[in-house]
Amino acid sequence: LTVLWLDFETRSRVDLGSKGVYNYAQDMSTEVLCMSYAFDDGEVQTWVPKYTPDGMMWLNNSPFPEAVAKHTGPIYAHNAAFERLIFWYVLQINFDLEQFYCTATQARANCAPGSLEDVGRFASVSMKKDHRGAQLIRLLSIPQADGNFREDAGLMAEMIAYCEQDVRAMREISKAMRPLSAEELADYHVNERINDRGVLVDVPLAKAAMRYAHDELVEIEERVAELTDGEITSVRSPKMREWVLERVGDEAKKLMLVKDKYSIDKTVRANLLAMENPDEIPPAVAEVIQCADDLWASSVAKFSRMADLADDEDCRVRGAFVFAGGAATGRASSYGLQVHNFTRKCAKEPDAVRQAMVRGHNIVPAYGKRVTDVLRGMLRPALIPAPGKSFVVADWSAIEGRVNPWLASSPAGEAKLDVFRAKLDPYKVNA
């Protein structure tokens, strides 16, 4: 079958990073700047539409390429979901999902980086991605300060050259790697169907959580200013690390030393709070650290992302899953909402907590010691399965620890496998 290689460059008033590819593609402001394409090993060509106040016109009265519109074979693109959704929602050309082959997925399945630039270095191919692209996107794909898009023939010529180079680079890189197996490709298409269906989320709950988080932020920063006599007014301040470092004991300082630098990151904060030694961590310092932990809680950010990514019409978050996103293992990963990484903690009475939150009632101390504790327990209840259905999350236990010794096929490897066969805890055995 003839392979169609292609790449789109687009512009939109929607921020792709914050709103996600589905909301981006479906927005009425999203337009195609150019489409570069090639069939098999043929020359790369480019189609450029022209926009008027009445809508999209074809440049020089040239219609959309008929050979592309009628293509029934495989369509190769890097991060192919983007091209597929632009076809569906912007150009309204309904190619079958099964026609699409994602070269970024192919790269990850080969334990290579997913970005076109990085995988080019990995594959050591001569055809490279053009570094100018990011600048051109900022200039042409994003509205200016006055809200209008830049119209510049010279920059557009550069954009076309950049788009064509991406097609050449993608084609050469893909050919340099092992292709996806039939099973991998089928699994990729299943992943995309799941992404198209989306996950229903509780938007009113997410917005309520954001209000509680904002109110707590004000209280936290007031408390931090009080505890530090005004030296620190925000736990996000770089001064906080130095303030803590000056007031903790020698053992605590050792815990703060990470790769020859002092840190106050999540792991360090957890270790310091676990000491529970007033000689090492004075009570006021411990409270400031706890305030920082509350403020930086990932649950707050997840609720914000949930509200941003949810479709305005049906409250579904789409495009959340990345097939073979864990490049080292091939396991699934997640974009945006990071649904694969929700805390296991769940509120004991989620319905009661939700009712209290959406009504604006006090949730502390009735449902937890701190607001962040309550919010953390409401992340999973914010995902809503269809009636009569359940969300199931499963993962292989210690997959790398099992596969690597099996691949080694050595006495030492067999000894490690025997630990798993005996159902022992490898961490305890190694300790």
PLM region spans:
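Cytochrome P450 catalytic domain signature, combining two hallmark sequence patches
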Residues: 94-97, 218, 251-258, 352, ...
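A short alpha/beta connector and helix-capping loop motif
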Residues: 16-34, 407-412
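Cytochrome P450 core scaffold surrounding the K-helix E-X-X-R motif
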Residues: 13-17, 46-48, 402-405
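Conserved "right-hand" nucleotidyltransferase catalytic core of DNA-directed polymerases
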Residues: 1-14, 34, 135-375, 384-390, ...
